[in-house]
C-alpha cells in the first residue's frame, strides 16, 4: 500500500516541484522559463521518463506558473511579491502576509570583494572552476550557475554561467556549503 501511495503521488510531486522552481527562477531570479524548465528536468532523477508528458505555462501578467502531466497531475505556483517568492497554490485561502520593514544596511561587498568579478589567482583554483562549469557528460549535466570562493573573509574567485551575474538572486536549497 505504501508504494502504491507513493506512485500515486508522483504526478503531483513532480508538477509541484517544477512549478515552484520555474515560478521562483522566472519571477525572482529573472531567468528564461524555457532554460529553467530544461535545466530542472535534466537534473531531476527519473524525469527523463516523463519529460515528454510534462507541459508548463507561464503567465507573466498574473505572475504564476502551471505545470501539468498528462492531466494526471497539475500544479499551480504563484509569485507573491518582493521578499515573499512563490508558493504552491492548493486552492485554499492564502494568508495575507506583510513583511516587517527592512533595515537599510550598506552592502558588505566593498569590504569583502573588489570592484569587479574576482578572477582566480592560481592555476589550481582556475582549474577547479573550469571543472565545476564543464559539462563533460551531457546525460548528467551539472548546470553550474555560480561559484563564489571566499578565504579569510574575502572573495578570492568567482564565476557565473551565461545569463547569471553578481546581482542574480538564485535559490540555493541546501547546496550552499562552507568547508
Describe the residue ranges of each PLM region.
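N-terminal accessory interaction module
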Residues: 45-94
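Short, compositionally biased leader-like segments
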Residues: 27, 94-128
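Beta-lactamase-like hydrolase cores
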Residues: 113-150
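A short acidic/small-residue loop/turn micro-motif
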Residues: 157, 161-165
Amino acid at each position: 500500500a505504501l508504494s502504491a501511495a507513493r506512485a500515486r503521488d508522483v504526478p503531483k510531486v513532480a508538477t509541484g516541484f517544477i512549478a515552484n522552481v520555474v515560478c521562483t527562477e522566472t519571477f525572482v531570479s529573472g531567468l528564461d522559463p524555457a532554460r529553467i524548465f530544461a535545466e530542472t528536468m535534466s537534473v531531476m532523477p527519473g524525469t527523463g521518463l516523463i519529460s515528454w508528458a510534462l507541459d508548463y505555462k507561464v503567465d507573466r501578467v498574473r505572475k504564476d506558473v502551471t505545470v501539468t502531466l498528462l492531466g494526471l497531475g497539475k500544479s499551480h505556483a504563484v509569485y507573491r511579491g518582493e521578499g515573499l517568492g512563490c508558493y504552491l497554490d492548493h486552492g485554499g485561502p492564502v494568508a495575507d502576509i506583510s513583511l516587517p520593514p527592512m533595515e537599510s544596511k550598506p552592502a558588505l561587498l566593498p569590504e569583502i570583494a573588489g570592484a569587479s568579478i574576482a578572477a582566480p589567482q592560481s592555476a589550481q583554483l582556475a582549474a577547479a572552476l573550469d571543472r565545476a562549469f564543464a559539462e563533460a557528460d551531457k546525460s548528467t549535466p551539472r548546470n553550474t550557475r555560480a561559484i563564489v570562493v571566499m578565504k579569510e573573509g574575502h572573495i578570492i574567485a568567482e564565476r557565473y554561467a551565461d545569463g547569471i551575474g553578481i546581482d542574480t538572486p538564485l535559490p540555493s536549497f541546501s547546496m550552499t556549503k562552507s568547508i
